[in-house]
């Protein structure tokens, strides 16, 4: 018989680095009632984290204020009670701030909490680490992927041959699909952004310019392996797979394409329409909408 009393990390860094932090405890091995052997302990290692304490405080306060303002200004929506912030050092790519709300105090679990309190935290989502587990459509920040694609592959709106070429963004674009997709898409800015090139389109967040790129991809490559060129660029930037941060239970997010829609039609038919992957899905994808999801750390 051996006696081994261990403190086990249940979540976060403590769980990820459990073996390093815990070390090896002293073990007393008995044979009957006699001590047969004492195995000396090995102390756990220290770990150094990259979080900036002051920035962490500022980020937490900012997120709380942002959620409060959102709730004050959008009365018709459900209450916003969840949020995440991730800040990376642009030179080292280390996480210098990470906030997930709602949260909880792990010290309360040292002596145990009531089932009622546990259920309240669980229902509120306090045990979720939203920076790495929350999966949401990334929205217009995804246009950076399309920008990179356009630069590298020289794929521009129809009629343009360089990044300096301009289109007239009038606020909507008619696609003329014959596959059942939506025919007219309206930009977020009524009336459009005027004459824009690639640089201006990312600065102004012009949907129409990027829809034009998606339309060219669809017309040139539909049904070929190159049809998913945008998705491949997204995956090369880390979308659709874990970031490999040293935290447990990281989500992957989703980068949708024709093959995934075919898989879903069998395994999760409620997620897709019977027609499968259409041109309109690519239009949604290029502006970070539709079936695509990403975690905050992937976006960061």
Language model region names:
Residues 22, 43-67, 100:
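N-terminal leader/targeting segments and the immediately adjacent pre-domain N-terminus
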Residues 1-44:
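Small/polar-residue-rich segments within soluble enzyme cores
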Residues 26-42, 51, 77, 83-86, ...:
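Beta-lactam-recognizing serine transpeptidase/beta-lactamase-like catalytic domain environment
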Residues 57-84, 103:
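Beta-lactamase-like hydrolase cores
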Residues 18, 22-25, 33, 60-68, ...:
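Amphipathic, well-packed alpha-helical segments that form the structural scaffold of globular domains
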């Amino acid at each position: 018989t051996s006696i081994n009393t261990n403190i086990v990390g249940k979540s976060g860094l403590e769980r990820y680095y459990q073996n390093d932090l815990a070390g090896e405890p002293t073990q007393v091995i008995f044979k009957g009632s006699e001590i047969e052997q004492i195995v000396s302990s090995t102390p756990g290692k220290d770990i150094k984290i990259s979080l900036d304490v002051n920035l962490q405080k500022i980020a937490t306060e900012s997120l709380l204020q942002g959620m409060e303002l959102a709730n004050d200004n959008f009365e018709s929506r459900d209450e916003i009670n969840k949020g995440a912030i991730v800040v990376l050092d642009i030179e080292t790519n280390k996480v210098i701030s990470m906030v997930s709300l709602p949260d909880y105090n792990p010290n309360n679990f040292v002596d145990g909490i009531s089932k009622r309190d546990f259920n309240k935290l669980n229902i509120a989502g306090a045990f979720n680490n939203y920076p790495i587990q929350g999966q949401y459509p990334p929205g217009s920040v995804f246009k950076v992927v399309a920008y990179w694609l356009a630069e590298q592959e020289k794929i521009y709106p129809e009629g343009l041959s360089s990044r300096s070429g301009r289109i007239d963004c009038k606020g909507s674009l008619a696609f003329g699909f014959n596959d059942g997709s939506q025919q007219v898409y309206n930009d977020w800015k009524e009336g459009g952004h005027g004459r824009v090139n690639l640089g201006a389109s990312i600065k102004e967040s012009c949907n129409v310019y990027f829809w034009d790129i998606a339309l060219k991809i669809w017309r040139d490559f539909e049904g070929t392996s190159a049809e998913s060129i945008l998705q491949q660029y997204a995956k090369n930037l880390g979308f659709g797979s874990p970031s490999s941060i040293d935290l447990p239970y990281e989500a992957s997010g989703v980068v949708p394409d024709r093959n995934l829609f075919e898989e879903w039609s069998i395994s999760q038919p409620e997620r897709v329409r019977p027609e499968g992957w259409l041109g309109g899905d690519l239009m949604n994808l290029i502006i970070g909408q539709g079936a695509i999801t990403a975690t905050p750390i992937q976006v960061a």
